[in-house]
Swiss-Prot record:
GO terms for molecular function: copper ion binding; superoxide dismutase activity. This is Superoxide dismutase [Cu-Zn], chloroplastic. It is found in: Plastid, Chloroplast. It comes from the Eukaryota.
Length: 211
């Protein structure tokens, strides 16, 4: 009986030795030392790099294709770098020679033609004026001039028509008018609201484009 018990104990010892992994698998080389939390400290260069990691506004571009009920049509492209002014390049054809009011209107709604684009874009609730005036609508962009062939080309640089932010012009509409804009100085009853620029010949909604 004792021989049987001794043999069973020996077999159990052998089974444990065969199945138990070596202690070294559970022990890191530094397990003899107590573990403390690890804290990474950046040097002066790393701290400066972290401060310099600021997300900047990239260059933005947009376009509006002008269409109307007449033969007037055109393309307006807009470019803005970071928070700088917006550059607007205009080319319109089919106009009568001379000056034509050119404005940015409040809405990008053309369901009823250019009439449904609403009034001039005017987030500051001011009266109509010239682009260089302190008191003006943000959408007051003055006049474009058509040559003898009815083609008007212009470049406008303006700080009040950004492509991002709360006053973004994306989704609003450019409108080219029948008459000259009097820039709020004509003394007409409409001078301080529309510049007495007459009917709306063509319009187009501003949309962002790939760079």
């Amino acid at each position: 009986m004792q021989a049987i018990l001794a043999a069973a104990m020996a077999a159990q010892t052998l089974l444990f030795s065969a199945t138990a992994p070596p202690a070294s698998l559970f022990q890191s080389p530094s397990s003899a030392r107590p573990f403390h939390s690890l804290r990474l400290a950046a040097g002066p260069a790393g701290a400066a790099a972290a401060r310099a990691l600021v997300v900047a506004d990239a260059t933005k571009k947009a376009v509006a294709v002008l269409k109307g009920t007449s033969q007037v049509e055109g393309v307006v492209t807009l470019t803005q770098d970071d928070q700088g002014p917006t550059t607007v390049n205009v080319r319109v054809t089919g106009l009568t020679p001379g000056l034509h009011g050119f404005h940015l209107h409040e809405f990008g709604d053309t369901t009823n033609g250019c009439i449904s684009t609403g009034p001039h874009f005017n987030p500051n609730n001011l009266t109509h004026g010239a682009p260089e005036d302190e008191v003006r609508h943000a959408g007051d962009l003055g006049n474009i001039v058509a040559n003898a062939e009815g083609v008007a080309e212009a470049t406008i640089v303006d700080k009040q028509i950004p492509l991002s932010g709360p006053n973004s012009v994306v989704g609003r509409a450019f409108v080219v008018h029948e008459l000259e804009d009097d820039l709020g100085k004509g003394g007409h009853e409409l001078s301080l609201s529309t510049g007495n620029a007459g009917g709306r010949l063509a319009c187009g909604v501003v949309g962002l484009t790939p760079l």
